[in-house]
Amino acid sequence: VTIAKVNGFCFTGALELAMACDVVVVANEAKLGDTHAKFGLRPTWGLSQRLPALVGLARARELSFTARMFSGVEAAEWGLAAVATPLADLDATVTGLIEQMAENSQESFVAYKDLYGAAESKGQAEGLAYEADTDFVFTDTAERLADFR
């Protein structure tokens, strides 16, 4: 699982890298933006696909065409970030997420990453069929169920 911890400025390629992570946690005070057009560039690391998938096509166009900055709070409100938190709490928030994740099945994470990848590349009907038909090996299920009391 990859986590982007965003503080300060996150523009252009940095924004593309953050969106490629599984979870984005951003400081409220962070400044983000797609500034490709400002500098005569084009996205090459997935922004043209990920940004509209996260925030919607209309907002993605507006952000890309204006190259305007937006806050961490806005990023979370729009779905680009999973969590926005005050800068003073950013490290603790990320650490808390890591601790929660560490308690869960790593084998489940492998399955989720594969299935979420399918969600990005297949239509819903094909993605649902893939989920139903794909087997994943879990060696910790019995132990985890026994410990669930």
Say what each PLM segment does.
Residues A67-V73, A88, A92, G96-R149:
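C-terminal alpha-helix plus adjacent terminal tail
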Residues T2-E107:
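Crotonase-fold acyl-CoA enzyme core
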